[in-house]
C-alpha cells in the first residue's frame, strides 16, 4: 500500500473522530459548561454548518496546488479542535466546532482526487476506498476511544487528541503526498453544470434525508441510552463500538448492493 494513501486516510480518520465524537460526549460537555443537552446539540450543528460553508469555499482555491490545499485544510482541523479543547464557554466551543467542520467536505473532495491520481492504472476506486477507510476506523474505534477518554479524563482531552492527530497527519501529508496535477479548471459556473441533470438532485436529496435520519438519533445517543434506555455511563463506550460496527457492515452491504 502506498504511504501517500495512508497519509490521506489519516486525515479522514481525524475528521471522522472530530465529527462524530461529540455524540458520545454531549452530556459531559453540557455539564461542564453549565448548559442543557439540547443546547449542547448546537455544537453538532455548528460542525455541520462548517461543512456546508467549507466545501463551497474550495471553489475559491481551485487553482491552488492540491497538496497545498490539503495542508491548509489539515491546519484548519488542528486549529478548530485545539480551540474546542480550551474553550472556556459556549461561544468559543461553538466557534471551534464551526472551524473544525470547515475542512471536512473539502478534504474528502480533494483527497479523493489526489488518491485517484496516485493510484495504479485501473485501481483508482480502490485507492479512494483506502482513503475513505479512515472514516470507517473512526466510527469503529476512534469515536468510542473519545467517549472513553471523556469518561475517564475530560471531554477536552478528546479534542486535544484530535488536534494532535491533525499535527501528525499534516506532517505525513507534507512528507508522503507528492504534488499532483489538479483537475481542469472549468471556471466558477462550470462547477455547477452537473446540477442541470435530475440524477445529482436525487442523490443529494437521498443523502440529505439519510443523514438527517441518522443524526436525529445519533446526535443524542448518549443521553438516550443512559436516561431513557437505562444503560450505565460505563457501558457507553462498548455501545458506541457496536454502533460503529453497524455502520461498517452497512457500508459493506450497500457497496455490494450498488
What is each model feature region?
Residues 90-92, 121-122, 126-175, 220, ...:
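Helix-loop-helix hairpin linking two adjacent transmembrane segments in secondary transporters
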Residues 34, 86-92, 230:
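Helix-breaking motifs and short loop linkers at transmembrane-helix boundaries and internal kinks
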Residues 47-49, 136-137, 241-245:
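Short hydrophobic/small-residue motifs within alpha-helical transmembrane segments
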Residues 89-97, 202-203:
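Short hydrophobic/alpha-helical segments at membrane-entry points of transmembrane helices
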Residues 4-40, 55, 217-222:
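Extracytoplasmic
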Residues 96-134:
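Cytoplasmic helix-loop-helix junction between adjacent transmembrane helices
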Residues 53-91:
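Conserved MFS/SLC helix-loop-helix module at the cytosolic interface between two early adjacent transmembrane helices
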Residues 176-204:
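Juxtamembrane intracellular "pre-TM" segments in multi-pass secondary transporters
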Amino acid at each position: 500500500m502506498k504511504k501517500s494513501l495512508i497519509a490521506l486516510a489519516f486525515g479522514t480518520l481525524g475528521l471522522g473522530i472530530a465529527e462524530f465524537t461529540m455524540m458520545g460526549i454531549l452530556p459531559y460537555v453540557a455539564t461542564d459548561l453549565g448548559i442543557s443537552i439540547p443546547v449542547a446539540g448546537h455544537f453538532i450543528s455548528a460542525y455541520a454548518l462548517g461543512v456546508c460553508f467549507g466545501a463551497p469555499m474550495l471553489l475559491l482555491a481551485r487553482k491552488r496546488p492540491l497538496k497545498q490545499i490539503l495542508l491548509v485544510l489539515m491546519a484548519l482541523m488542528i486549529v478548530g479542535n485545539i480551540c474546542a479543547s480550551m474553550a472556556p464557554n459556549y461561544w468559543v466551543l461553538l466557534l471551534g466546532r464551526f472551524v473544525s467542520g470547515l475542512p471536512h467536505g473539502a478534504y474528502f473532495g480533494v483527497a479523493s482526487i489526489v488518491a485517484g491520481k496516485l493510484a495504479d492504472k485501473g485501481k483508482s476506486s480502490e485507492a479512494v476506498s483506502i482513503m475513505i477507510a479512515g472514516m470507517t476506523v473512526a466510527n469503529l474505534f476512534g469515536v468510542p476511544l473519545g467517549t472513553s477518554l471523556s469518561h475517564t479524563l475530560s471531554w477536552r482531552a478528546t479534542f486535544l487528541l484530535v488536534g494532535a492527530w491533525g499535527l501528525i497527519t499534516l506532517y505525513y501529508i507534507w512528507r508522503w503526498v507528492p504534488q499532483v496535477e489538479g483537475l481542469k479548471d472549468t471556471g466558477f459556473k462550470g462547477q455547477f453544470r452537473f446540477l442541470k441533470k435530475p440524477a445529482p438532485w436525487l442523490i443529494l436529496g437521498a443523502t440529505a434525508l439519510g443523514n438527517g435520519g441518522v443524526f436525529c438519533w445519533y446526535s443524542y445517543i448518549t443521553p438516550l441510552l443512559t436516561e431513557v434506555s437505562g444503560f450505565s455511563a460505563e457501558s457507553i463506550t462498548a455501545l458506541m463500538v457496536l454502533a460503529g460496527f453497524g455502520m461498517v457492515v452497512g457500508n459493506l452491504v450497500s457497496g455490494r448492493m450498488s
